[in-house]
Amino acid sequence: MSKIAFIFPGQGAQYVGMGKDFYDAYEEAREVYRKAKEATGLDIEALCFTENDKLNITEYTQIAMLTTEVALLKVLESKGVHADVCAGLSLGEYGALAAAGVMELENLFQLIRLRGIYMQEAYPVGGAMTAVLGLDAGVIESTLKGIDGIVSIANYNCPGQIVITGEAQAVEMAATALQEAGAKRCIPL
């Protein structure tokens, strides 16, 4: 007997046009975008489907990601595809909560809108985050000590993936230094 798992991504997986094919093809997806717009007052379609500077600002990224995740989820469910288990990374945990039916969508959208706003306030424009792949935490920690400006580890996602954050210029310098120290990749978030 096979089991189905839904895994929801965290912030950093966003891109302009995400979910557009589903939005165009399925009423279930369009309904989710409408509900998110009603709950938050934001033009989620414009945020997700048109070139703009907002999509990569935490305040907007989070609601855009969650709306897209839930839209895809509702399309799959309308086709009879349901998860036996679900999980999510960071922001993706809320997509998993939606899949589990733990919260009403309106409340979930409002919660994530506020989460994005509060995180943005704690992490103002001028800051940056980067995922560092394939480098030992000890090497990252020691490398960051040599960087001018404010930069530190924000999250130990899993072995081999650590997120750094701080002043944009310091994070950029750290990413360069970490790649020189052996990181497989540094991905701005």
Where are these regions (language model features)?
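Helix-rich "cap/lid" substructures immediately adjacent to catalytic or cofactor-binding pockets
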Residues: 2-87, 164
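Short, glycine/charge-rich beta-strand/loop segments that flank catalytic centers
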Residues: 52-53, 87-94, 116, 127-131
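Conserved functional loop/turn residues at catalytic and ligand-binding sites
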Residues: 80, 90, 182
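A short small-residue
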Residues: 48-55, 95-96, 187-189
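Gly/Ala-rich beta-loop-alpha elbow adjacent to hydrolase catalytic centers
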Residues: 69, 84, 88-92, 96, ...
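Alpha/beta catalytic cores of group-transfer enzymes, especially the acyltransferase/condensing modules
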Residues: 11-13, 40, 100-189
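Beta-strand segments within the central parallel beta-sheet cores of soluble alpha/beta enzyme folds
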Residues: 47-49, 86-90, 112-113, 189
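Alpha-helix C-terminal capping segments
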Residues: 74-79, 97-103
